[in-house]
Amino acid sequence: MRNHRTSIVALATVASLLAGPAMARCVDNSERQAMNMRVLQSELMVAALTCGQQGEFNAFARKFEGELVTHGKMLRSAFQRAYGGQGEPRLNAFVTRLANEASQRSIADRAVFCPRAAELFNVVLNTPPAALPAVAEQQSFSSTHDATECTAEVTREASSVKAPATKAKSR
């Protein structure tokens, strides 16, 4: 059993290292919210499987289906913009990395992970749907996506870059 756990942790660590940063570019606020929502969803999914909280996860998925779908589409769109044809595989690697990291947290200290997960399910299931992104952002694990939010300065710099001038063709 111990060797099996060690193998899982080693595999998860390698997978998370290979996945690299979540995005090659900075993300806007709505994309960051979508990433935080996906991190929360992954954490709760691992909690459901690890801690026997499938009923709570199903209640979460039913209650927040609309928000999860909306943020999922936003996340898919962000990865398509950032990576073009590689958007889907990069998104899949990102989601896998999040699940692996949540699994690592559960394995590292299950005695703490499961009670915290129960508290988190309680908070989430008592949260109005519109407030779920704020709850997701407040979690200590929400920054595990490693995405950097665009600042006004970055946005200003990007908009001030001009395309190179082209010479007019002479007739």
Residue ranges and their predicted role:
Residues A12-L17:
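Hydrophobic helical h-region of N-terminal Sec-dependent signal peptides
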Residues M1-A10:
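Bacterial N-terminal signal peptides that target proteins for export
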Residues R25-A59:
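Immediate post-signal-peptide N-terminus of mature secreted/exported proteins
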Residues A19-P21:
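N-terminal signal peptide c-region/cleavage motif recognized by signal peptidases
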Residues F64-S170:
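Compact alpha-helical subdomains of small soluble proteins
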Residues R2-N3, M23-N36, P89-N92, T144, ...:
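N-terminal secretory-pathway/extracellular module detecting exported/lumenal segments
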